[in-house]
């Protein structure tokens, strides 16, 4: 879960502001300096920052001025970093396994030319990974073999929590899937218990088996990232997707080194919502290392935010009755969104051209207000156009509160080796920080063509979602410039159906690229259509076709 709606309205978005950021012309070469060092000082007021805005477009500066005028006190008091979570680190002796990145870094082998080279690429010396065996009988989430633990970045005091479930079927041969929720700032453990994991939790805290769990035929890693999300913690912060990608590569490298029995299996990355940002970057990071122990075969993105310039154009059609469901907005509101679109697209284009915080933040603020705000103000569920938001304190879903209650139980945290004092399903500070580093509108879709040259990509979308709707996802896949674009756009749409012939959606595919529309599902497809989601997952993992 989820692309958070917290930053849709300007009041929420203006809760914080970031200092000047270097232009991310080549982000994969600019992230070498620790984020916590680069962003270690509190914010200056917006009035002070305007001295540095000389290179901004007039449109972008106007948005900054609007926010400053409406929320001057919030801007003056803004602080970029949240307080670290209270935590107590356990000694290494408390864990069943400890693997040190420095040990992996120091392994040298002889290549075919007789030259010495590192066995595995990457700067791993600052990373360690700790793991413990989870007793399935104590928690009762599933009967399969499980591990939980932390990836530690010792240099930057970052600690990412993960929970691994072995396949219920044939773990020695079944693939491994990394699952990522979005937000940014939402725990992947919400995906575990709300969507695709082995069990769900009711209002009484009772566990219920999920027969459509994604570990039916695959082992699954649920990862709380970036730091300070879920059970993860840090004394600093990660506030952009690029920095998070380095951590994920390190985690997977150390995990497969410690558990080589899974390293030979096919590996896939899947996620939803803001994972539409995460997955292209994380995949690019993995594929950039030619000597690796990660057998990456494909990626899957569900209801993602990937190409804002294309996707934001489709909020008005979805809200106004052109996405297969009745209109939520009246004609005057739809017209206002039409009128706002050119300015929104101009701001996003400026962000794409410069990749600078000064262009990307105004684009996010203006477009979120103009293109999402009218819908959100109706009280309709932004994650499912078919109904109202029933529990605003839990992002419209009461089950999120039940999950938090369960994961805050001392017995649960003890069995998992948790080192923080509390669990929250979503960290809104992370969401704010990513927004005000300009990450929200970064053009990470530009990485997809290179990925398509190497591995298959599946984009799927529940057709009742508003916030990352199927119209926008279909549009960006068709707009993507890559060698196979013409063939993909000309491909025939086919029915997606279960073995019994029941139609669950449609899809189109060409080369390594596939787009699927899932009927009757909102933002969280595995929750709304569990049988259909497991069916297309199994088909995809089998031969990358639906």
From Swiss-Prot:
Family: Belongs to the peptidase S10 family.
Annotated glycosylation sites: 217, 512
A GO molecular-function annotation: serine-type carboxypeptidase activity
Catalytically driven reaction(s): Release of a C-terminal amino acid with broad specificity
Keywords associated with the record: Carboxypeptidase, Disulfide bond, Glycoprotein, Hydrolase, Protease, Signal, Vacuole, Zymogen
Subcellular location field: Vacuole
Cited function: Vacuolar carboxypeptidase involved in degradation of small peptides. Digests preferentially peptides containing an aliphatic or hydrophobic residue in P1' position, as well as methionine, leucine or phenylalanine in P1 position of ester substrate.
List of catalytic residues: 273, 465, 523
Domain of life: Eukaryota
UniProt source species: Sclerotinia sclerotiorum (strain ATCC 18683 / 1980 / Ss-1)
Entries under InterPro entries matching the protein: AB_hydrolase_fold, Peptidase_S10, Propeptide_carboxypepY, Ser_caboxypep_his_AS, Ser_caboxypep_ser_AS
Main localization category: other
Any single Gene Ontology cellular-component annotation: fungal-type vacuole
Residue numbers covered by the propeptide annotation in the UniProt entry: 18-132
Protein name: Carboxypeptidase Y homolog A
Cysteines joined through disulfide linkages: 186-426, 320-334, 344-367, 351-360, 389-396
